[in-house]
Amino acid sequence: MSKIAFIYPGQGAQAVGMGEDFYEKSPLSRTIFDQASEAVNLDLKKLCFEENDLLDKTEYTQVAMVTACLAMTRAVESMGLHADMTAGLSLGEYCAIAVAGGMCDLDAIRTVRSRGIFMEHAAPEGSGAMSAVLGMDAAVIEDVLNGREGVSIANYNCPGQIVITGEAAAVAEAGTALKEAGARRVLPLKVSGPFHSPMMRPAGEELAKVFAGVSMNPLKIPYVANINAEVITDCGRIEGLLVDQVSGSVRWQQSVETMICEGVDTFVEIGPGKTLTGFLRKIDKNVKAYHIGSWEEAVQVCEELK
C-alpha cells in the first residue's frame, strides 16, 4: 500500500509571499498566522507577505518559515490529504515534528523563534563559513576532511551535493583541498553563521533551556530525525535530537532512504521553493515527488492523491 511523507525545507527556501494565498483562503491558515504573531510578538503576515529586510535574517527567517509551512499543512490536511510519515531538513524538522504530533504548532513556532536568535549570535560575525561541495562522493569528502581541525560536514543533501561548515579559514582550506581531490565545484554559501558545526554548540545549550518549558506529546505518526536518519516513534527522544541537530550533521539523503525503506513511495514537499524535490530526484528517481507552495498546487495535489 502506498505511503505518503510530508517533507519540509530548511532555511534558504524562504520567499516573500509564502503562505499569503493560504491566509486569504483558509481559516485554519489564518488562525495559525494570527496566533503565531501574538505568541512571538511579531507581525508574521508583514514578515512573510511584504518586501522587507528582515526575512533573510536568521532570527526572523526561522519563525517565518515554520509558521508559513505549518499554515500550509493544516490547510492541506483540511482538504483530506494526510501524511504517514514526516521529515524536514534542518529547520524543517520542527514542522515535521509538529505535523507528526510531537509538539503543538505554537510551541514549535515559539521554539524556532528562540532557535533563530541563538544561532544568529552563536558565533562572531565572519568567524565561520559554509560551502557546498558538488560532484564528489561523500566518502571522498570525509577522507579529505579526516584529521582537519575546524571543519566538518553540515549536510548530506543528495548524491553529488554535500555542504561543509566550520571556522572560516578551515572551510576555505578544505575547499581548496577538495577541488584538488577532484570536486567539480566548491561554492561558498551566503549564510550568517557556520550552521551544523561545533561552533553552534552554545546555541544548542541555550535551546536545551527553552525545551525545559516545552511539552512533548506522543507521536501520532513517525518522523525521521536529521541527526541519525532514524525513524522516531518515542517523543522522549525529540528534545535531545533537536539540541544535537544544531551542531551536528543533517543526514538528509539517508533520511529519505530510510523513509523509502519504510515503504514511502510518495513525497509531498510543503513550503516555498522546490529544493527537496530536486534532491529527491537525485536520491531515487522511482519515487513520486509533489510540491505544495501555493493554494493552487495544494488543490491540485490533494485532488490527485486523496
Give the predicted meaning of each segment.
Residues 2-140, 185, 189, 266-296:
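FabD-like malonyl-/acyl-CoA
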Residues 48, 145, 175, 280, ...:
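Short, flexible helix/strand-to-coil boundary loops that buttress conserved ligand/catalytic motifs
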Residues 1-5, 213-226, 231, 240, ...:
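Cys-dependent protein tyrosine phosphatase-like superfamily
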Residues 77, 179, 260-263:
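Non-catalytic positions within long, well-ordered alpha-helices that form the structural scaffold/packing
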Residues 64-70, 245-252:
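A short, flexible low-complexity segment enriched in Lys/Arg and Gly/Pro that occurs
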